[in-house]
Amino acid sequence: MDLLKRHLAPIVPDAWSAIDEEAKEIFQGHLAGRKLVDFRGPFGWEYAAVNTGELRPIDDTPEDVDMKLRQVQPLAEVRVPFTLDVTELDSVARGATNPDLDDVARAAERMVEAEDSAIFHGWAQAGIKGIVDSTPHEALAVASVSDFPRAVLSAADTLRKAGVTGPYALVLGPKAYDDLFAATQDGYPVAKQVQRLVVDGPLVRANALAGALVMSMRGGDYELTVGQDLSIGYAFHDRSKVELFVAESFTFRVLEPGAAVHLRYA
């Protein structure tokens, strides 16, 4: 059976299209991590784990028998529930073009936060180590927005000295992003100065990131594996409400910890 169970929902096709489009706009506009790392998938619901290629010794074995256990990294299945009004959805079939889908947007934003937070800061209970916590490079303090050009240049230099080639992206948490794009120095936007002088990749806003990151986009350093990609499914309904959910299954692996430098920015 299809785990999304959309065919059981009391929702007309046009309303489903409106729901999907609302969520799609959030995903396309807010997802940051998957734009910066290698993406594998989607492989579907049945894909359960990533083969790491590693072995773990087993101590308690028969005499003269060497046994090892293959290691895998399981995918986490994530759901964010939300509720919509049945009458509101039925109005779409009558020609309404602006149904109230705010709860769809909020659920999609929560899913974006879950995925990006796992990528940047890890998710210990799911066996995921994030980019920030994995890097061996010392974090660089950015005391003020005017220090960003120096800090980003220093971070890129650290990566080059470690043999990590570019292009390099600058990933900014919400405060760092807003402050950087609002700042000027001698009448010139600091963000343009950063991009022109010290970053040959994109400047990306990541709402789930604390501070900022300078990271390589050469590929092969970070890997997001997706089973079921971002989808909307049906849970249950009564006469007035229908409960839906945003769902995804994924895991994230850091293959080269030294491919990023964290910038601390209060």
From Swiss-Prot:
Q: Name one GO biological process term.
A: intracellular iron ion homeostasis
> Which GO terms of the cellular component aspect does the record hold?
encapsulin nanocompartment
Q: Classify the main location.
A: other
Keyword field contains Iron: yes
Q: Does the keyword Acetylation apply?
A: no
Q: How does it assemble?
A: This encapsulin nanocompartment is formed by 60 subunits; monomers form 12 pentamers which assemble to form shells. Shells are loaded with 4 encapsulated ferritin-like protein decamers (EncFtn) in a tetrahedral arrangement. A 3 nm gap is consistently seen between the shell and the cargo.
Q: List the disulfide bonds.
A: none
Q: Where is the protein found, in the record's own terms?
A: Encapsulin nanocompartment
Q: Name one Pfam family in it.
A: Linocin_M18
Question: What protein family does this chain belong to?
Answer: Belongs to the encapsulin family. Family 1 subfamily.
The entry's keywords:
Encapsulin nanocompartment, Ion transport, Iron, Iron storage, Iron transport, Transport
What InterPro entries does its record include? ENCAP, Encapsulin_nc
State which residue ranges cross the membrane: none
Please state what the protein is called.
Type 1 encapsulin shell protein
Role this protein plays: Shell component of a type 1 encapsulin nanocompartment. Assembles into proteinaceous shells about 21 nm in diameter. Small pores form at, or close to, the 2-, 3-, and 5-fold symmetry axes. Data analysis suggests the 5-fold pores open and close with maximal and minimal aperatures of 15 and 5 Angstroms. Cargo protein Fer (ferritin-like protein, probably stores iron) is targeted to the interior via its C-terminal extension; empty intact shells can be isolated in the absence of cargo protein.
